[in-house]
């Protein structure tokens, strides 16, 4: 029995193969319905107020949470091409020193290269040493990060940091 492929059959087979490949490529490159995710903050600041002893250096923690299903690169990612998470604080009337980032968690990509990453997921804390004069002030700054899910990484974002500080 001789089988012949008509143009119609060939087009159907080609479409059956091409559509999943194109869809997979778009998903891995973040091309399908990713625009809303790219504009969204995937990290939130959990610390909103600090009570300190005036004129005494103290270690405090700034708590952040990464949205479930996402991760961000650690402060020291394994690849120099990856965007690190960086906290920049404006000292104002506060004396700030010794930022200490947590170690990243091991994470293996399930798509693409399958490379190992050093990331933050869930809740993480950055420790800082602060000395505040007596009174009320606001600790301000930014957290710069790049959020990724299992299929794509999104443009780097900057999260504003604003924390009320009362020193007595």
Where are these regions (language model features)?
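Extracellular/lumen-exposed scaffold segments
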Residues: 25-168
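Bacterial N-terminal signal peptides that target proteins for export
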Residues: 2-17
